[in-house]
Amino acid sequence: MAEKATQKDRRGALVRAAYSQIAERGFEGLRTREVAREAGVNIATLHYYFPTKEKLIEGVVEHAMERFRTTLAPHGSPADQLRNHLRSVRRLVQDEPQLGIVMGELTLRSARDPGIARIMQETNEAWHHIVRGLLRRAVKEGNLRSEMDSDEVAAMVVATLRNLTLPMASSGARGDQALRQLERWIGVDGSSRGSGRKHSSN
């Protein structure tokens, strides 16, 4: 048990060091030897846990998504959970600007790196699955309009939240404005309830 805990600690230290480097220097500034030194291990130990740089990036993305998962509260109705998720993501990226910087760097890199593109796509699909599940449950319970296409709406929610993690969008009134409009459009702004309500297209 102690050895497993030590391995987990070492792996976590390496991931956090890589995460910090990307936030401070960008993806191009990520150096595995410096990551190992910052984590207090040698380069051989880093390669034991992360044989390739792509595996290290997977660890960084998982660390970032763990932060996003803290915004998913299990209490309340599905509609309440979705509204809280939207608002909590907004607060999270404002409180932890490194998170948006890291995700932005990796998103940009994914356009030129198939390995990172795969990692980011898998992350998007997992997030989409969670949001779609909340939407479907909210429709089933009568909290949202019955004609809602949960898959398409989930795609819009995830795209909006991903955009709000970017540094330029994570602060200022426009981000808040976009989030409020998204809540109203979906029907989770708390102003009304029931599957029969109508939404204006204006």
Report residues per predicted region.
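Generic hydrophobic, amphipathic alpha-helix propensity
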Residues: Q7-Y19, V35, V60-A64, F68, ...
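Hydrophobic/aromatic residues within well-ordered alpha-helical segments
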Residues: R10, K53, V60, A64, ...
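Solvent-exposed, amphipathic alpha-helical segments
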Residues: A13, A17-R25, R67-T71, V102, ...
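Helix-turn-helix
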Residues: A13, Q21-K55, G59
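Short coil/turn segments at alpha/beta junctions that flank glycine-rich nucleotide-binding fingerprints
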Residues: E24-R25, E96, E141
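Hydrophobic alpha-helical connector segments
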Residues: G59, T70-G100, S150-V157, D176-L179
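Amphipathic alpha-helical segments used for helix-helix packing
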Residues: Q94-R118
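Hydrophobic/aromatic-rich alpha-helical bundle segments in the mid-to-C-terminal region
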Residues: I116-Q121, E125, V139-D189, R193-N202
